[in-house]
């Protein structure tokens, strides 16, 4: 199938959040499965610093009374064709720039639609988040082009109809929706980034005021878990960790723990229970729970704790003050560093992720990949990727709790701390986690089924994953 991904982000050249990871990784795997997948992205001012872009455009268009150009390149590290939408509005050297985002991304979406109508005609346009929400509305006029809309962040829903009416053409049947809701209504298929979150957003607690619409279109709504790049994030070959290891050589992993303790200033003790946390310091990630109970947990146990991340100033200050109370046992790094994050995944015994809500989550999959046992709240994608440890039946991959309460988190962490004492059982738990398949190939198979369902096509024959992953 001919498929065009239209998005505001694409790793590794333009990434702010998880959407960039999806758009940067999924197309290259789908191409190896036989699809002709291409990406349509804004031509940001910083892109020439990150990749080679031909000087001359391949096409010139007109949208919303504006001239624009389209340049063709290749997404670095892949064979995925990349179309770059050129307009002065995207010259600033950052992806999101505040007050003019509604206008910029409506123009971008309109330009993508014109490109598909007049230059390269895909069978499916795969739209991502509110930035591209008008495309399914406009494509409703083109029955030979279908649309898939992926919700990465339901909280941001884009401009409303009254604003869109002033700057572009809106069909009368769009009613009063914002761009997110319009896309949900008019796309041929809608998905979010985990099955559990797809169910949760149909409720008032998670639906961000459009739960009624999401329930109404539930027949075309599904959830597909994101993947991680298992070639880049591989403890057997990771050059950023002190000692490489596999599930069969877990004894080597201890060297990473000692190296991490030395690097972040913790007391060097391979028997200490070391919890890691790599996160944005915001309420969504459960920081209010952590602040309420971490002092009690550190006082009650002999555990160690290391935090890496940035976010709200309040949470940064609170975590910094907590760390000062436990020198040698707690370290806080208020920054983001990919190499250090890998060393935390590889050196920690457990990984804390008590999210208030979590559409998918990547960190818990990274932790499992590197043998760190997740401690998570059962919500969204965490339900779909981490199962509760059952020592009797030798099942599960982590420690889970349900209620968003400090005592529930404290109890769950105590269980993990106590479980760490039983080293043979803990190693089996690590092996189960490391054996989980979080590759993009697994996600790509689900998207392939989704695309085929639009046209009533049968599922594709099984392709050997090793042939695809070997070339990622």
Swiss-Prot record:
Keywords, sorted A to Z: Glycogen biosynthesis, Glycosyltransferase, Transferase
PANTHER family: ALPHA AMYLASE DOMAIN-CONTAINING PROTEIN, GRANULE-BOUND STARCH SYNTHASE 1, CHLOROPLASTIC/AMYLOPLASTIC
Superkingdom per UniProt: Bacteria
Protein task: Synthesizes alpha-1,4-glucan chains using ADP-glucose.
Family note: Belongs to the glycosyltransferase 1 family. Bacterial/plant glycogen synthase subfamily.
Annotated organism of origin: Trichormus variabilis (strain ATCC 29413 / PCC 7937) (Anabaena variabilis)
Pathway note: Glycan biosynthesis; glycogen biosynthesis
Gene Ontology terms describing biological process: glycogen biosynthetic process
Protein name: Glycogen synthase 2
Amino acids binding ADP-alpha-D-glucose: 15
EC number: 2.4.1.21
Catalytic reaction equation(s): [(1->4)-alpha-D-glucosyl](n) + ADP-alpha-D-glucose = [(1->4)-alpha-D-glucosyl](n+1) + ADP + H(+)
GO molecular function, one term: alpha-1,4-glucan glucosyltransferase (UDP-glucose donor) activity
Enzyme class: transferase
């Amino acid at each position: 199938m001919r498929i065009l991904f239209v998005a505001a982000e694409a790793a590794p050249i333009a990434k702010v959040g998880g959407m960039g990871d999806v758009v940067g990784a999924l197309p290259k795997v789908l191409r190896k499965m036989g699809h002709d997948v291409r990406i349509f992205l804004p031509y940001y001012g910083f892109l020439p610093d990150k990749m080679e872009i031909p000087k001359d455009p391949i096409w010139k268009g007109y949208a919303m009374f504006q001239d624009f150009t389209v340049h063709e390149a290749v997404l670095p590290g892949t064979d995925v064709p990349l179309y770059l939408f050129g307009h002065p509005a995207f010259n600033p050297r950052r992806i999101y720039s505040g007050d003019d985002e509604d206008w910029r991304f409506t123009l971008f979406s309109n330009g993508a639609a014109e490109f598909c109508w007049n230059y390269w005609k895909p069978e499916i346009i795969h739209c991502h988040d509110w930035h591209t929400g008008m495309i399914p509305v406009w494509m409703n006029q083109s029955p030979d082009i279908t649309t898939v809309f992926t919700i990465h962040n339901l909280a941001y829903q884009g401009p409303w109809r009254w604003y869109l009416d002033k700057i572009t053409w809106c069909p009368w049947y769009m009613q009063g929706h914002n761009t997110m809701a319009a896309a949900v209504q008019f796309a041929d298929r809608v998905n979010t980034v985990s099955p559990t979150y797809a169910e949760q957003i149909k409720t008032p607690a998670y639906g961000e005021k459009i739960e009624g619409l999401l329930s109404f279109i539930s027949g075309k709504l599904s959830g597909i878990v994101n993947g991680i790049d298992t070639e880049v994030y591989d403890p057997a070959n990771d050059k950023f960790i002190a000692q490489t290891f596999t599930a069969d050589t877990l004894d080597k992993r201890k060297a990473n723990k000692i190296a991490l303790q030395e690097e972040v200033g913790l007391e060097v003790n391979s028997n200490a229970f070391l919890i890691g946390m790599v996160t944005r310091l915001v309420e969504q990630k459960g920081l209010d729970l952590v602040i309420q109970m971490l002092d009690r947990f550190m006082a009650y146990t002999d555990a160690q704790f290391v935090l890496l991340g940035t976010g709200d100033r309040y949470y940064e200050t609170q975590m910094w003050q907590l760390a000062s109370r436990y020198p040698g046992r707690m370290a806080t790094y208020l920054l983001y560093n990919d190499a250090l994050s890998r060393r935390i995944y590889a050196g920690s015994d457990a990984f804390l992720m008590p999210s208030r809500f979590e559409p998918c989550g990547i960190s818990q999959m990274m932790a499992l990949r590197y043998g760190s046992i997740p401690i998570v709240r059962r919500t969204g994608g965490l339900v779909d990727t981490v199962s509760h440890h059952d020592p009797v039946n030798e099942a599960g991959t982590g420690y889970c709790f349900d209620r968003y309460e400090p005592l529930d988190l404290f109890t769950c962490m105590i269980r993990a701390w106590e479980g760490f004492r039983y080293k043979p059982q803990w190693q089996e738990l690590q092996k189960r986690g490391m054996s989980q398949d979080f590759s993009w190939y697994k996600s790509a198979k689900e998207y392939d089924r989704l695309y085929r369902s639009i046209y009533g096509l049968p599922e594709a024959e099984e392709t050997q994953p090793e042939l695809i992953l070997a070339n990622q």
